[in-house]
UniProtKB/Swiss-Prot annotation:
Sites where the protein binds (R)-pantoate: 61, 155
Chain positions recorded as ATP binding sites: 30-37, 149-152, 178, 186-189
Keyword tRNA-binding included in the entry's annotation: no
Active-site feature positions: 37
Primary subcellular site in the record, as a coarse category: cytoplasm
Organism expressing this protein natively: Halorhodospira halophila (strain DSM 244 / SL1) (Ectothiorhodospira halophila (strain DSM 244 / SL1))
UniProt xrefs under NCBIfam families: cyt_tran_rel, panC
Annotated protein name in UniProt: Pantothenate synthetase
GO molecular function: ATP binding; pantoate-beta-alanine ligase activity
InterPro entries named among the record's database cross-references: Cyt_trans-like, Pantoate_ligase, Pantoate_ligase_C, Rossmann-like_a/b/a_fold
Length: 285
């Protein structure tokens, strides 16, 4: 496993693999790796000849007052975690390498139908920054397939839309959420919580499961379900329930009539930790 820090070196390595007819996979991360990231790595390693994991804390997707400076940088531990897992290269550039010689505002990518609601409303500009860095990574590594986790469900749909709309030649693979035994979705930000906050945190998943169960049992009063769920989160000790929302799976639009599948999404804060999660509901026709 080699570590690459320069864009041109990563391009040359990928193109050498491609010239030999090898299939390339990419797992984009911001580091501080946990079992959820390693699941992405292991799933993709079985499908490709060469696997690249990128580790880059992308400044473009952090807004003013967010945790860019505080976000954990654990490169040595991450490299150790990736050893022996079928990873051929770790692409770990710094911000100057990824965004050389330019000052903001950078070129943006706008997906208005998917980015102005839910987490996009709470974090203006976040998904534009995600889209830019993902496109850059895809252009640098030139993978045949890239893996993203379902936990960041809105991000996953934004990336799928960008790849489709811009005719990018890459397959996007969705990997299921990895959870703790009590249901909490694994996240690099879970470490922000103290012991009491960590004990409260599984209520987000439990609440979304209740919403999904109500939908599967026949309830269709979306707004009332969402409001009840937010009240439950606040009663469970969350500092703020940013949203609980029932949406169509593909475009995150509000449901219209009968839908075979819906996704229940939520975001809530416990101290410095902003937790997100989602649960799918399969509806009876």
């Amino acid at each position: 496993m080699r570590q690459v820090t320069e864009r041109n070196a990563m391009r040359e390595l990928s193109r050498a693999w491609r010239a030999r007819g090898e299939r390339i996979g990419l797992v984009p991360t911001m580091g501080n790796l946990h079992r959820g990231h390693l699941e992405l790595v292991e799933r993709l390693a079985r499908r490709v000849d060469r696997l690249v994991v990128s580790i880059f804390v992308n400044p473009l997707q952090f807004g003013p007052g967010e945790d860019y400076d505080a976000y954990p940088r654990t490169l040595e531990a991450d490299l150790n975690a990736l050893e022996g897992r079928g990873v051929d290269a770790v692409f770990a550039p710094n911000a100057r390498e990824m965004y050389p010689g330019v000052e903001p505002p950078w070129t943006g990518v706008d997906v208005p139908a998917l980015t102005q609601t839910l987490c996009g409303a709470a974090r203006p500009g976040h998904f534009a920054g995600v889209a830019v860095v993902v496109i850059k990574l895809l252009n640098i590594v030139e993978p045949d397939v890239a893996a993203f986790g379902r936990k960041d469900y809105q991000q996953l749909q934004v990336i799928r839309r960008v790849v489709g709309d811009l005719d990018l030649s890459v397959e996007i693979v969705e990997v299921p959420i990895v959870r703790e035994a009590d249901g909490l979705a694994l996240s690099s930000r879970n470490g922000y919580m103290d012991g009491e906050q960590r004990r409260r945190a599984p209520a987000l998943y439990a609440t979304l499961c209740e919403v999904a169960a109500a939908l599967e049992a026949g309830r269709r009063d979306w707004s009332q379900l969402e409001a009840q769920a937010c009240r439950r989160l606040e009663a469970a000790g969350f500092d703020a329930a940013e949203y609980v929302a029932v949406r169509r799976c593909d475009d995150l639009a509000e449901p219209q009539g009968d839908e075979p599948r819906l996704v229940c999404l939520g975001a809530a804060r416990l101290g410095a930790a902003r937790l997100i999660d989602n649960v799918e509901a399969r509806l009876k026709r």
